[in-house]
Amino acid sequence: ISRDYNQVHINPLDTTLATFRIDYPFYKEGVGHAAVGALGQASLPYNYFERPQYRNFSFAEGFDVYTYRMENVPFYNLKRPYFHFMYLESGQKKFREENFSLTLGHNISPTTGFNVNYRSRGTKGLYEWSRTKNHNLSVAVSHTGKRYSVHAGFINNHIETRENGGVVGEWAIRDTTFEMPSGVPMKLTSSEATNTYRNNAFFVEQSYGIPLLPVTESDFSIANLPAVFIGHSFEYNSWSKVYKDVRGTYTDDRYERDADGNFVPQDGLEYYKNWFINPTQTRDSIYERVISNRVFIQAQPWDRNGVVGTVNGGVGLDLHTYSQFRLDSYLNGKYDKVDKSSYFVYGSVEGKIKKYVDWGADAKFYPSGYRGGDVSFGANLTLTGYIRKRPLILEGRFRMETRSPDYWQENLFSNHYVWLTPLRKENETRFEVAFRVPDYAFEVGVWQGIVTDKIYYGADSQITQDNGTVSVTSVYARKDFRIAGLHLDHKVLLQWSTNHSVIPVPLVSAFLSYYYEFWAVRDVLRVQFGVDGHFNTRYYAPGYNPALSEFFNQ
């Protein structure tokens, strides 16, 4: 469901055969992600243009492929009750990965239904101190009548991770043999570092349609009539993060070489350089809440599928609350709380020309106050042709944004990192062109992005802002071959960045999946077996800082 309008987005048909063999969600789309570790842990897409950009609580960006949000909560319209259960596990009990999902959907009437989706993914970890639990729940209710429609939902995301800080050196993986992976030395093992994330959200979006022509009994809906829709969107969304550790050290057996070329070990090394609040242990608690209200109008001049399908407009007000520990908390006995409000106007227009052309344009502007001056506008055009009833789809997209930094990028007080840093707005322009032939599993795409004043985390994990302009170009190709039951799937991504110290990307990334598929029992049990391969060229891959829950450039 759209945040701005009571407008649903149709998802591809969900089947157990589509990418069923891929149990890591960060490998299902594109060429995959650079992952911190196993199932349930943070990851970052190789494709720069697929990387999430959260306006609120950016600490959760690394878990984007797992979490439910208002825009990705599924709704179902069913003729029969639907139930789907899945449980997968792998590895020995001591290192086990588990993937559990449950979906229940039911329509009370042809226009009213509800569904529950629950996902639990996690690992006990091959490496020391890497256990992760990732739980995600969504409960949704929808009603789509002739005039009145409503979509509502509740979301709970709960993530617990043990943070080991990564290996003490490349030598521990590259040219050293350990009897078990659990023997590989990690930087934060003795520190017993953990992160706990909690998210609760509730939303309801509703609209009422006023037809401009009489509605007859034969009209199933007013989508084919001139009409005006008036609606309201409400969302309550709260996130919290608690990071804990104790002061510990690690030993690097190959810290440096002496004059004879022999390795010299170094003990007493610490992962964090600073302990601002407590010199022996850490408990950093951060809380953020956003209460959002939007009022919108959708004008339908002719019908929903007309040349000008809808002309939309709305106003919104977001109430932000941020809470963290500060030195003042010693005096007043409670965490510091900051309240901010941002208001904005937005609009869009979209239409179709039969089944051959889809087009749209949108804009959003914050006039003043918090995030004042932020602006976003974009356009899209889709051309569809047919050869022997097989579609050929050409898509183009454009987006230009000026956006303020996240609150935590300018204000942070924690045991290991402290900053009060005014930052400039980022400016980014993106172009995208894609060509798809679905019946032949063929797709190519090109992205071009130009970013000015990019905000990122430097090699010391400190917030940093570039003073120039960075250009990123990506070229993507996908082609799947099928020979009887044999599947040969290929995805390749090429990327270029004009400044790898600001936006590092691999030149080549690829994902290959070769497998054979057949019916073990006709129409009852289908089997797939094969091999998947991931590849990327050498580059300065991002590191991950547990205290900040952010990827940083190395």
Report the location of each language-model feature:
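Membrane-proximal, glycine/serine-rich, low-complexity loop/turn segments characteristic
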Residues: 1-200, 209-224, 386-392
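Exposed, low-structure sequence patches enriched in small/polar residues
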Residues: 78-80, 189-252, 256-261, 265, ...
